[in-house]
């Protein structure tokens, strides 16, 4: 019995040394970065500057980064190894967009120069079905943007400023498949703003009155689908060529508002070309 008391601590100490330090296993953050360029026709109406519809072409740059965590269990298995990594059910997506367009009315006696930058922060829950071939996502996003619209013909009030903030539910579906030996995926995503704020001058109000004299006239307007029905949707196809993933798709962006007795819309139909890059950022959990 006394001999057992001497052997037992030695055995326990050996077992503790053999167990892996699971608490120090790396925690990875998987990032999918997509850089896209879009080009296509656009249609702009802004009754503050002109009652005419202006048609032209738009060029848009999009940088999108989707992040989700991959965690490792801290409980060792019977083989002395930690359990396999588990992917988080939540993703965070950051999107930067910069767009410029050049358009003309039917009379072709004037031009619109349009520029806009927007930033989108989205959070989504995702589900995997059909043996991980189908991925569904749903969540919400916040978007902030600012830009300008300049009419080359107008002498008074030649430009219009754009600034907005909105919150929107979003959803997407992605299906993975193979074309012979080529890996591919088709994806659809959409967002529909429900609540936001928008800067707009009032009907007949000049920017001189607003900024030089400080005459505020309901220039910050709350927006809903009733006075600013807006939709952004994208259908894309990803395909792998060796170790590289490319994207081709369609982006439809329909921004519109009717506030302060003024009408505004910017419709874009863009062909999207992009490159998809996936990588992991490792962290050591203390």
Predicted stretch roles:
Residues 33, 53-61, 71-77, 111-119, ...:
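Residues that define the transmembrane beta-barrel architecture of outer-membrane proteins
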Residues 39-45, 96-104, 142-150, 175-177, ...:
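Transmembrane beta-strands of outer-membrane beta-barrel pores
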Residues 23-93, 286:
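Short glycine/proline- and aromatic-enriched beta-strand/turn motifs that initiate or cap beta-hairpins
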Residues 44-51, 62, 103-111, 154-160, ...:
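Extracellular loop and loop/strand-boundary signature of outer-membrane beta-barrel proteins
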Residues 189-191, 199-201, 221-222, 228-286:
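Predominantly the C-terminal beta-signal and adjacent terminal strand-loop region
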Residues 29-35, 71-77, 86-94, 132-140, ...:
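Outer-envelope beta-barrel architecture signal
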Residues 156-243:
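Outer-membrane beta-barrel transmembrane domain signature
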Residues 39, 59-69, 75-85, 119-125, ...:
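Residues on the lipid-exposed face of transmembrane beta-strands in outer-membrane beta-barrel proteins
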């Amino acid at each position: 019995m006394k001999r057992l008391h001497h052997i037992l601590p030695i055995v326990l100490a050996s077992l503790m040394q053999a167990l892996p330090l699971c608490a120090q296993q790396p925690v990875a953050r998987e990032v999918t970065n997509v850089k896209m360029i879009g080009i296509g026709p656009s249609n702009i109406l802004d009754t503050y500057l002109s009652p005419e519809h202006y048609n032209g072409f738009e060029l848009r740059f999009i940088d999108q980064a989707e992040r989700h965590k991959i965690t490792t269990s801290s409980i060792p298995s019977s083989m002395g190894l930690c359990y396999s990594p588990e992917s988080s059910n939540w993703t965070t997506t950051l999107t930067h967009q910069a767009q410029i367009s050049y358009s003309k009315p039917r009379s072709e006696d004037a031009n619109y120069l349009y520029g806009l930058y927007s930033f989108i922060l989205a959070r989504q829950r995702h589900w995997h079905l059909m043996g991980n071939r189908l991925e569904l996502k749903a969540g919400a996003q916040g978007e902030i943007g600012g830009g300008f619209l300049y009419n080359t013909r107008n002498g008074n009030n030649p430009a219009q400023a754009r600034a907005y903030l909105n919150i929107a539910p979003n959803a997407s579906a992605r299906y993975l498949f193979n074309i012979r030996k080529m890996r591919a995926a088709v994806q659809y995503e959409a967002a529909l703003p429900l609540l936001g704020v928008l800067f707009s001058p009032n009907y007949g109000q000049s920017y001189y009155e607003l900024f030089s004299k400080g005459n505020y006239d309901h220039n910050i307007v709350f927006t809903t689908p009733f006075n600013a029905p807006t939709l952004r949707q994208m259908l894309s196809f990803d395909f792998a060529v060796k170790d590289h993933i490319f994207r081709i798709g369609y982006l439809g962006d329909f921004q519109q508002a009717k506030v302060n007795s003024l009408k505004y819309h910017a419709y874009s139909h863009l062909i999207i070309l992009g490159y998809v890059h996936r990588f992991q950022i490792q962290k050591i959990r203390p």
